[in-house]
């Protein structure tokens, strides 16, 4: 934003020492050779002197680990990290503001699904920490710590280390298990448990004896009961069986009951939930660098103060809102009408009517004058500062109107939840369309106000001078006043700074205004007078000729015969 630090700096050159006409003072505004086009309510293309781009279109090619804490899942997604899959041990105890999931993350253990995948993913991401609290579970006459060849850890058969696979005992027994855990703490607990779906009935009886099995998990407010779905499936890491993982939140004072006759994948403890933490998740292949930024997208971090961005609709942290427009320019200067070089110093000089002054560099509004001492140009601080004060806070006000920071994660749903995914995408697309429209309308409103304000200040300056001069000068209709008294540079300065005393010059101005001067004929007046003179001469010549003919006819000197 232009900051005016020079008060009425006069750029003058006495190039017209021999000027003998009446002094002239004109008002105009700043202009540049090439302005910037902005959109207003009334016009899609209005040229202004200066404008500020509001849409960020450049991003860093990396993710910034400061000030937000980033945790790189590497080959593990957040759910595998919570289950304790092999290869995810680096996530034990991890704490984050943003959990970075990689597109190349893979499952490395027994094949599984999560019926409420998106909900569990969101809970884990928002919690911001893998704070696992191990517990003692007293299971009755069953074998614990089941392992699978699909789940290798250091080339040894293993399993998810946060879960306990219960199978029948060596004595071929799997009695009813009924175990209760009470939450006596002051925080909510997240229990993750599973149900194994064997591929055949033989596998079911070999592992659990009972066919069918059943798993029921209850709290005071909820109950989930699952019967295993026995059936052959495509082999994944050598297994045609599957595990379905479920989750239950136990609030302080509540309890959880595990009831099963087979197929339970039991928890080894719980995750501590932090309701105060507001963390999130981002799926991207962009590497983590060493920069600083509060905003991250799937295409890289943003470092900007602009209120909008069109880089990515997926953004986390303290981010500008995503809009579809590639550019939205906020006018920070007045309407630009470049000066016409052929007009000269005082040819149609009214900047707010016809054109601006490119030489007016110290302010937005100013004066030009011509008197016996020469010519000069000076900026006017008062009107300039008045306009700047009204415009200066526009960007801040615009940011305040959009201060609900944009935060949009990419939601992932299981394949069976495709309709939910479609609905989610439709809602997000609609929100973006609305925000894009609102942003464009908001900027257009602000631009219209800016142009109206700057035009108004130009008119105020003109009226201020007119009220000072009154009948001491004549408005020439082009932004200039012809002054009818002697006005040296000190007099001109008094007009500019508002200290001009009309009464001092009143008598002189009145005398000069009504003084009879010789007629100064311009080429246009000469033509009119010549035509009038010629017409009168012709009329008199014809009249004399007719009078002579009538006189001659009466005296018999001329004989007229009219034949029909």
From Swiss-Prot:
Cell compartments where the protein resides: Virion membrane; Host apical cell membrane
Signal peptide: 1-16
Modifications made to the protein after synthesis: Palmitoylated. In natural infection, inactive HA is matured into HA1 and HA2 outside the cell by one or more trypsin-like, arginine-specific endoprotease secreted by the bronchial epithelial cells. One identified protease that may be involved in this process is secreted in lungs by club cells.
Main location: virion
InterPro entries: Capsid_hemagglutn, Hemagglutn_HA1_a/b_dom_sf, Hemagglutn_influenz_A, Hemagglutn_influenz_A/B
Gene3D superfamilies: 3.90.20.10, 3.90.209.20
S-S bonds: 26-480, 64-291, 76-88, 109-151, 295-319, 487-491
Ranges per topology, Cytoplasmic: 549-564
Residues exposed to the Extracellular side: 17-527
Membrane topology: Single-pass type I membrane protein
Membrane-spanning intervals of the chain: 528-548
Site entry (Cleavage), positions: 343-344
A GO-annotated cellular component: virion membrane
Assembly: Homotrimer of disulfide-linked HA1-HA2.
Similarity comment: Belongs to the influenza viruses hemagglutinin family.
More about this protein: Major glycoprotein, comprises over 80% of the envelope proteins present in virus particle. The extent of infection into host organism is determined by HA. Influenza viruses bud from the apical surface of polarized epithelial cells (e.g. bronchial epithelial cells) into lumen of lungs and are therefore usually pneumotropic. The reason is that HA is cleaved by tryptase clara which is restricted to lungs. However, HAs of H5 and H7 pantropic avian viruses subtypes can be cleaved by furin and subtilisin-type enzymes, allowing the virus to grow in other organs than lungs.
Protein name: Hemagglutinin
Organism: Influenza A virus (strain A/Duck/Czechoslovakia/1956 H4N6)
């Amino acid at each position: 934003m232009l900051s005016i630090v020079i008060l009425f700096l006069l750029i003058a050159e006495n190039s017209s020492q021999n000027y003998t006409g009446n002094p002239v003072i004109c008002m105009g505004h700043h202009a540049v050779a090439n302005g910037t086009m902005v959109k207003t309510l009334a016009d899609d293309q209005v040229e202004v002197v200066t404008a500020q781009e509001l849409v960020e279109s450049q991003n860093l090619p990396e993710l910034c680990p400061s000030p937000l804490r980033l945790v790189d899942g590497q080959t593990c997604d957040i759910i595998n990290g919570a289950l304790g899959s092999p290869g995810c041990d680096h996530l034990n105890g991890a704490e984050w503001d943003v959990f970075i999931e990689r597109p190349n993350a893979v499952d490395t253990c027994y094949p599984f699904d999560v019926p409420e995948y998106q909900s569990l993913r969101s809970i884990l991401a928002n919690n911001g920490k893998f704070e696992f609290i191990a517990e003692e579970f007293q299971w009755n006459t069953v074998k614990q710590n089941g392992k699978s060849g699909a789940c290798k850890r250091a080339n040894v058969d293993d399993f998810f280390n946060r879960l306990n696979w219960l199978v029948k005992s060596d004595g071929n027994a799997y009695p009813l298990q009924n175990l209760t855990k009470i939450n006596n703490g002051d925080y909510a607990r997240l229990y993750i448990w599973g149900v194994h779906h064997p591929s055949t009935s033989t596998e079911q009886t070999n592992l659990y004896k009972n066919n069918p099995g059943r798993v029921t998990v209850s709290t005071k407010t909820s109950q989930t009961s699952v019967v295993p779905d026995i059936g052959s499936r495509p082999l994944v890491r050598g297994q045609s069986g599957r595990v379905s993982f479920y989750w239950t939140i136990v609030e302080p004072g509540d309890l959880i009951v595990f009831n099963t006759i087979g197929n339970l994948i039991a928890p080894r403890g719980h995750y501590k939930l932090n309701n105060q933490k507001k963390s999130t998740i981002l799926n991207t292949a962009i590497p983590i660098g060493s920069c600083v930024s509060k905003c991250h997208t799937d295409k890289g971090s943003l470092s900007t103060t602009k209120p909008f961005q069109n880089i990515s609709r997926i953004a986390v942290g303290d981010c500008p809102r995503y809009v579809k427009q590639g550019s939205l320019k906020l006018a920070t200067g007045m309407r630009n009408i470049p000066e016409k070089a052929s007009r000269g110093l005082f040819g149609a000089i009214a900047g707010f009517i016809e054109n601006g002054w490119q030489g007016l560099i110290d302010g937005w509004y100013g004066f030009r004058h011509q008197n016996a001492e020469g010519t000069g140009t000076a900026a006017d601080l008062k009107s300039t500062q008045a306009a700047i004060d009204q415009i200066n806070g526009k960007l801040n006000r615009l940011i305040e109107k959009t201060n609900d920071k944009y935060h949009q994660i990419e939601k992932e749903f299981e394949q069976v939840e495709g309709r939910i995914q479609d609905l989610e995408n439709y809602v997000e697309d609609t929100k973006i369309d609305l925000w894009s429209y609102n942003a464009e309308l908001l900027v257009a409103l602000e631009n219209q106000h800016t142009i109206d304000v700057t035009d108004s200040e130009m008119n105020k300056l003109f009226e201020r001078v007119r009220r000072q001069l009154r009948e001491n000068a004549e408005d020439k209709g082009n932004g200039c006043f012809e002054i009818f008294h002697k006005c040296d540079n000190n007099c001109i300065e008094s007009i500019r700074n508002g200290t001009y005393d009309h009464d001092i010059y009143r008598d002189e101005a009145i005398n000069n205004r009504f003084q009879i001067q010789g007629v100064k004929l311009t080429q246009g007046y000469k033509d009119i007078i010549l035509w009038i003179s010629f017409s009168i001469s012709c009329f008199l010549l014809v009249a004399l000729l007719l009078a002579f003919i009538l006189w001659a006819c009466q005296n018999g000197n001329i004989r007229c015969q009219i034949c029909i």
